[in-house]
Amino acid sequence: MGLKSYLLGRNGEKRAEAFLIKNGFTIREKNFHSRFGEIDIIAQKDGILHFIEVKLSEKSDPVYMITQKKMEKLLLAIEFYMMKNGLELPYQIDGVLIKKNTLEMIENLTIM
């Protein structure tokens, strides 16, 4: 990943974080790394943990950037996070998708 891509990604995560806070989420952790992969944002609202994947694209629809393989890695990282922190809370996987100046949150992501 080049510097430009890295900076765009970090900017997208900051925008997503501001959006989440504005909408009543509490940010628990950002950029959680494990050997299974990274979780961009871990937030909580109404007793539910939200594991949030942030995708930013200037050209195509960012929803297509969340692949089956990415979801599988994310699920392993979530299991590790929950076990490491001794958590047994309900959770869901969400996406914050950013294309140019449009930000959209999709809750309960699944890939068939």
Curated annotation (Swiss-Prot):
The family this protein is said to belong to: Belongs to the UPF0102 family.
Pfam families per record: UPF0102 (PF02021)
PANTHER family for this protein: UPF0102 PROTEIN YRAN (PTHR34039:SF1)
GO molecular function: nucleic acid binding
Protein name as annotated: UPF0102 protein NIS_1551
InterPro entries assigned: Restrct_endonuc-II-like, tRNA_endonuc-like_dom_sf, UPF0102_YraN-like
Organism: Nitratiruptor sp. (strain SB155-2)
